[in-house]
Curated annotation (Swiss-Prot):
The lineage of its organism: Bacteria, Pseudomonadati, Pseudomonadota, Gammaproteobacteria, Alteromonadales. Keywords: Chaperone, Cytoplasm, Disulfide bond, Redox-active center, Zinc. It is found in: Cytoplasm. Coiled coil: none annotated. This is 33 kDa chaperonin. The keyword Thylakoid does not apply. CDD domains: Hsp33. The gene is hslO. It comes from Shewanella frigidimarina (strain NCIMB 400). GO terms for cellular component: cytoplasm. One of its GO terms (biological process) is protein refolding. Belongs to the HSP33 family. Under oxidizing conditions two disulfide bonds are formed involving the reactive cysteines. Under reducing conditions zinc is bound to the reactive cysteines and the protein is inactive. Pfam families: HSP33 (PF01430). GO terms for molecular function: protein folding chaperone; unfolded protein binding.
Length: 286
């Protein structure tokens, strides 16, 4: 049974919707690729949960990228996913990072870029500065700018588990936001330990036991890297053939490493010759 799931829920007595995501296996898969500092482990967990919530909220078919960049010790943290809740991620850092480092201490002067690439239609990109207190507040600002919908986000991660909640006024509903303010106040009382140990139904009962809540069927969230030998070969082929041949002469082979999952793809002289002759096969050995 998959222990990484996202639930949507809606209030029958208010024009408000919500989501809850709880992650463990996919989170550990992302962390296993590199030995991340403690603070960065937590940030990656929050970013995973956030991307899952965003993907479920912004109804579209295609790919999503949530990327943080800055001039601090952490230069990049990115989660890529799609509407099927398949996620992968990686971060780059340099130097020591305190275990309790804040978002600004990790990224310095930075920004968040959310990119939606639908299967059909034009790509959309939204940018928010990282000058808010935490990642959740940055995402709330994104929704304020892009959709102008009152939104509350809660994110938690501890290096082992990650979880998040999203509460939002339904699109096309306007006027009195008293219901949202009331439900937002209830949601803000959630504790990390509750999201890590209780199932979605128990969490919603604890928060909203006096409300009329409908919980929808869960959606699995999974880690899967999209790297492949064919993609690595295509990347090599973008280089001038003379440059590739020089590397081969010096190294005897060309190795491509995936940052996301640490898979290695090796190409020897025979592979490279086949690649440029058009007879390259993805069945070659890694």
């Amino acid at each position: 049974m998959n222990n990484d799931i996202l639930h949507r829920y809606i209030f029958d007595n208010a024009d408000v919707r919500g989501e809850i995501v709880q992650l463990e296996s996919s989170y550990q898969e992302v962390l296993s690729a590199h030995i991340y500092p403690v603070a960065l482990q937590a940030l990656i967990g929050e970013l995973l949960a956030a991307t899952s919530l965003l993907t479920a909220t912004i109804k579209f078919s295609g790919d999503i990228s949530v990327q943080l960049q800055g001039d601090g010790p952490v230069s990049l943290a990115v989660i890529n996913g799609n509407n099927k809740q398949v996620l992968r991620g990686v971060a780059r850092w340099n130097g020591d990072i305190a275990a309790d480092a804040s978002l600004q201490q990790m990224f310095g002067k930075g920004y968040m870029v959310i990119t939606l690439t639908p299967d059909e239609g034009e790509r959309y990109q939204g940018i928010v500065s990282l000058d808010h207190v935490n990642l959740a507040a940055c995402l709330e600002e994104y929704f304020n700018q892009s959709e102008q919908l009152p939104t509350q986000i809660q994110l938690f991660a501890n290096g082992k588990q990650a979880a998040g909640m999203l509460l939002q006024v339904l699109p096309a509903k306007s006027g009195n936001n008293d219901d949202f303010e009331h439900l937002s106040a209830l949601t803000s009382t959630i504790k990390a330990e509750e999201l890590f140990t209780l199932d979605a139904e128990q969490v919603l009962h604890r928060l909203y036991h006096q409300e009329e809540v409908r919980l929808f069927d869960p959606v699995d969230v999974t880690f899967k890297c999209s790297c492949s030998r064919d993609r690595s070969a295509a990347a090599i082929k973008t280089l001038p053939q003379t440059e590739v041949e020089e590397i081969l002469a010096e190294e005897g082979k060309i190795e491509m490493d995936c940052e996301y999952c640490t898979a290695k793809y090796s190409f020897d002289a025979i592979d490279i010759a086949a690649l440029y002759s058009g007879s390259h096969s993805s069945q070659s050995q890694q």
